[in-house]
Swiss-Prot record:
Top-level taxonomy: Bacteria, Pseudomonadati, Campylobacterota, Epsilonproteobacteria, Campylobacterales
UniProt cofactor(s): Mg(2+); Mn(2+)
Cytoplasm keyword on record: no
Binding site for Zn(2+): C400, C403, C416, C421
EC numbers on record: 6.5.1.2
GO biological process: DNA repair; DNA replication
Protein name stated in the entry: DNA ligase
Example GO molecular function: metal ion binding
Domain of life per record: Bacteria
Keywords: DNA damage, DNA repair, DNA replication, Ligase, Magnesium, Manganese, Metal-binding, NAD, Zinc
Residue intervals of the BRCT domain: 577-656
List of residues binding NAD(+): D32, A33, V34, Y35, D36, S81, L82, R133, E167, K306
Length: 656
């Protein structure tokens, strides 16, 4: 709570410093939740003391002034910031201000993506500039980098001048992969997907941007000459131009419907492909929007209904070391319990000891913890201003916490090299039975631990020798449960080849790489390092890991393959793919089809096609359903082959 004008001025200075770090340096000094709390206190003081309001207050401006090597570029129409609401009562108050004057107003609700706002300017159908939000009036010109974002069309079927606005994001999956690469290269990790997206969009080298797998999700328009009556019509028009559709978009009439949409999003939040921090609510009727107008900073016809925070501050009270299936030691921080988005968090990964030293994290530190989707909670950084002298250095272990074998300490990672370490064996089997490997139902972590304790198994081969009486020795196992597990183990025989390769737990070889390897047949693991390097997406580390793993485990691998007899259906699929007319072709689907577009997209991808959301001169086929819209005209302009649904089905049938 701000009690004086002096505290008010200090708060402005502090919040402006935070904004500068957030917008210009891609660095979050405090969590979003802490910033929101400080901002709301500032706003409350200004509401009580309007004569004290300063022009440089963050409530009076959008974003931050840019201070980067990129040139500044003005927006044709201002990019506004949204006012936040944090609970039902605040939302109700916001709605009442609108509905008491416009009782028939409706509201478009959509996910609030946590990324970087970008303004795309098209003139006569051509992308002429891409500018970040900046201070709302002008931002950074990042056109060359934006052109490397795969789902931003360089041309659209609209001749007028139009600003299309949206969010540049990186998916949670791609964010984790990017940070894994940086970790292995001993580079600083990105704190969160938003920082990764911002840093990637603002690279001086566009080739780096191209590699980062950024995505653009549209959410509105700036200057335009469209004649639509509703905001939803505008969004539908943007999608028809070749931009990706907005997931979980809904049109609502009242508070109850908006709350239902909000809670649906919260429910889907963890499984959503990108990081969300709320729901955007916009008055649908453009005439009402115009009459409502703007405050100095925000539109009165829209707000952001924020989600509960996924970042919190807590204290490290201890550190334990876990041993992975490769022998890598992972330090895990024990935390004072803290609730993050409805889940109680009492531990978080510290990645490795090199990362601990780089971030200068100490025992008894107060730290920022983040939890994103299904990702294990992690510590972003220490809050050094809270240090009181009780902190201690977190020391690297010298022996394995499980088998007491001496550890190998490399520059980044620390390893237990004892191949018979129980932790390594146990973790290998947990992975072997996991969903993306052999997916053995009922064979979870606790069951595997019991099997080890009873000395019933040492490796994966032992699973297939288990008998009913063996399982009956385990805690909480009766005849039916034991028989079900035996049946599930037997059912895991004859798996797809890629699943068995993935189940081996080879370092640097995940699900995607396993599928690539499976294309080369049952003897793929016997290939040389040079042959592995010729495979798409395989680097030196992966090739080296494969060769070393096979050399060390030849007998075990052969025995496992003989016992499980994996199916080599991947080879047949590759043969079908190579003979397909759609192999290596870029395809766009548009209009209403009898099956969901995603179903057709999956069929075509299985035949080697690349699915795109926008038509260009590089498009090979346009698949059209009913009401194809502007994409059909654009396809004819570029000489793209057009197939209707009947023709597509005929060609697919010919390939069976």
């Amino acid at each position: 709570m701000i009690k004086s004008q002096k505290e008010y001025l200090e708060r402005i200075e502090y919040l402006n410093t935070l904004s500068h770090h957030y917008y210009n340096l891609d660095e979050s000094i405090v969590s979003d939740a802490v910033y929101d709390e400080l901002y709301q206190e500032l706003k409350a003081y200004e509401e009580k003391n309007p004569n004290d309001i300063q022009a440089n207050s963050p409530t009076q401006k959008v974003g931050a002034t840019t201070t980067t090597p990129f040139s500044k570029n003005p927006h044709l129409m201002r990019m506004w910031s949204l006012d936040d609401v944090f609970n039902q009562s605040e939302l109700q108050a916001w709605l009442q201000r609108i509905l008491k004057v416009y009782p028939n107003a409706s509201f478009v609700c959509s996910p609030k993506l946590d990324g970087v706002s970008l303004n795309l300017l098209y003139h006569h159908g051509k992308l002429v500039s891409a500018t970040t939000r900046g201070n709302g009036l002008e931002g950074e010109l990042v056109t060359n980098n934006a052109k490397h974002i795969a789902n931003i069309p360089h041309f659209i079927a609209y001749d007028g001048e139009i600003e299309i606005r949206g969010e540049v994001i990186i998916s949670k999956e791609d964010f984790e992969a990017l940070n894994k690469e940086r970790l292995e290269a001993n580079e600083p990790l990105f704190a969160n997907p938003r920082n990764a997206a911002s840093g990637s969009l603002r690279q001086l080298d566009s080739e780096i941007t191209k590699k980062r797998k950024l995505q653009f999700i549209p959410w509105g328009v700036g200057k335009h000459s469209l004649n639509f009556l509703s905001f939803k019509e505008c969004l539908d028009f943007i999608v028809s131009l070749g931009f990706g559709a907005i997931q979980y978009l809904s049109l609502n009439k009242n508070h109850q419907e908006i709350e239902e949409s909000y809670h649906t999003l919260i429910k889907e939040r963890e499984g959503f492909f990108a990081l969300l921090d709320g729901m955007v609510i916009v008055v649908n009727e453009l005439g009402i929007q115009k009459e409502l107008g703007y405050t100095q900073k925000s539109p009165k016809f829209a707000c952001a209904y924020k989600f509960p925070a996924l970042e919190k501050h807590t204290k490290i009270i201890g550190v334990i070391n876990q041993v992975g299936r490769s022998g890598a030691i992972t330090p895990v921080a024990l935390l004072e319990p803290v609730e993050i988005a409805g889940a109680m968090v009492n531990r978080a990964t510290l990645h490795n000891y090199s990362e601990i030293e780089k971030k200068n994290i100490m025992l008894n530190d107060r730290v920022v913890v983040i939890r994103s989707g299904d990702v294990i909670p992690k510590i972003i950084k220490p809050l050094e201003t809270y240090r009181d002298g009780s902190q201690h250095k977190i020391e690297r272990p010298k022996v394995c916490p499980i088998c007491s074998h001496e550890l190998l300490c490399e520059e980044i990672f620390t390893y237990c090299q004892n191949l018979n370490c129980p932790a390594r064996l146990k973790e290998s089997l947990i992975h072997f039975a996991s969903k993306d490997a052999l997916n053995i139902q009922g064979l979870g972590d606790k069951v595997i631990e019991q099997l080890f304790e009873e000395k019933l198994i040492v490796n994966a081969l032992d699973l297939y020798a288990l008998k009913l009486e063996d399982l009956m020795r385990l805690d909480k196992f009766k005849i039916k449960k034991a028989q079900n597990l035996l049946d599930a183990i037997q059912k895991s025989k004859n798996p797809p080849l890629w699943r068995l390769i993935n189940a081996l737990g080879i370092e640097h070889i995940g699900k995607g790489a396993s599928k690539t390897l499976a294309r080369y047949g049952l003897n793929v693991l016997e290939k040389s390092e040079a042959e592995f390097l010729e495979m798409e997406g395989f680097g030196v580390e992966m090739a080296h890991s494969l060769v070393n793993f096979y050399a060390s485990n030849q007998e075990f691998i052969r025995s496992l393959f003989d016992l499980l007899n994996p199916k080599n259906s991947d080879m047949a699929k590759e043969k079908q793919k190579s003979s397909s007319v759609f192999n290596n072709k870029t395809i766009v689907l548009t209009g209403t089809l009898s099956k969901p577009r995603q179903e057709y997209a999956q069929m075509l991808e299985n035949l080697g096609a690349k699915i795109s959301s926008s038509v260009s001169a590089k498009t090979d086929f346009l698949i059209v359903g009913e009401n194809p819209g502007s994409k059909l005209a654009l396809a004819k302009k570029h000489g793209v082959s057009v197939l209707n649904e009947e023709e597509l089905l005929k060609r697919l049938k010919e390939l069976d």
